[in-house]
Amino acid sequence: MKRKVIAALLTLTMVFSLTACGGSKSDSSKDSSKKEEKESTVDTVKDPITISFWHDRTSDTDYAWLKESIDEFNKTNKYGITVEEVGQGYLDDVQAALTTAIAAGDSPVLADLSCNGIPLFASEGVLADMTPYIERDNFDMDNVVKELTDYVYYDKQVVTMPYTRGTAILYYNKDLYANAGLNQAPTSLEELNKYAKKIYDNSNGEVKGVGYTIEPTYYQHYLLESLNNVGFMDADGKGASCLDDGSMKQFLTDWYNWTEEGWCEIPALENASSAMQEDFYNGKLGAFVSSSNRATSISEKAQAAGINLGMSYTVGYGGYSAPLGGGSIGIIGKDHSQQEIAAAWEFVKFLMSDEQVAQNHIKTGVLPTTYSSVETDTLKDFWADEKNEGYKISYEQVKDASAPAMSMYTSEWNSAVRSVYSELIQARDITPDQALDNLKSEASTIFE
């Protein structure tokens, strides 16, 4: 695996590069000449064109907003660009479908990409560098929320823009908490677990206290990060010291014991997220951790079910801890014309406008991705409403949230860890010690 990745990296070349010059008039003239030459190579859309966009925004509220957003762009852009969307399921499904399509030479021009997939596609030279368009249009990259640029840059190129990024939220049933004598959201994992046990005991085992689905780079990553400060993968993306420093062993043992004791829900084998939410809406689950990207959908469904919903910061060992996840939009440069790439950039630029960013957050719960959007009256007024406190929380905890390192190993390591977690927590086929041994074996192959 490692040899293939290195080979891919060696073949990666930059399409555009600038040499910083200064001082003499001669140097300045050369610099200006180079800039003009570079800008002349950046296409502007000349004729009406249709481009495709593959995404994971298939839930009710997500899809409704996406359609509204695309319809507005299609009607208002001055170039005659038509964007056609194709839902692919979840982000992992987008990655799988895109991999197949690229191999067949039939890929979309745009895709919403996961943190797992971005380094793979970037290292293979699949993603177009947006830098020339950014420079031509004076797009301010400093306006993009710094913490959300972790998967934007690759080898000095801008290969994505943050689009459906999110943190996690603790969604909890306020009435169940109140009935158990709990009048505030937990401030640490230890406190959350204490609450969960109390709710479980008070219901004679009828109501689980808390639940997590299996998402190694997201829900489990931040719990590990609260133990070891790096999560499930090292900061350089080249190893997993959590396997040797005791943090993974502690987490595997704890999670197994929580579910064994009954108060922590075991995620379903299929449609785990939907199943867990249904238990919550039916009053069978006191709290669960899910993405802020689902805040609007969860809020609406909880209200319809008569659930008094609370939304709070996520917690890890010893205090607050949160993950960063979600998707970033990339332009697929491989096998596409400069006209298609230019059209795709116009859509990306539209999505990054203040009003689009603000409404994307309001309508769905995904994070606002630009500082200027946070300063709009649209967002300020929305956050000022007490019932939207959870949305504001999602943005406030970004500064302390973490995501796995951008690494070409992330996708494969994520798959291996997910499989072992499933064997331990869902199938109950192995012990925590066996799970750790299996992970060490997988790591020795992946990070060889």
Positions of PLM-derived features:
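Conserved N-terminal structural module of periplasmic/extracytoplasmic solute-binding proteins
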Residues: 4-8, 21-124, 138-139, 184, ...
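Short, solvent-exposed loop/beta-turn-alpha elements that line the ligand-binding surface or hinge
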Residues: 43, 131-144, 208-210, 214, ...
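Extracytoplasmic/periplasmic substrate-recognition and gating elements
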Residues: 75-76, 180, 260-264, 300-367
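Short helix-initiation/N-cap motifs at beta->coil->alpha
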Residues: 87-97, 116, 189-194, 267-281
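Hinge/lid segment of periplasmic solute-binding proteins
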Residues: 115-167, 204, 220-227, 247, ...
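Long, aromatic- and glycine/proline-rich binding clefts that accommodate carbohydrate-like moieties
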Residues: 151, 309-312, 362-419, 423
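Extracytoplasmic/periplasmic solute-binding protein
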Residues: 154-163, 168, 193-241, 256, ...
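Glycine-centered hinge/linker elements that transmit conformational signals in sensory
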Residues: 196-198, 238-269
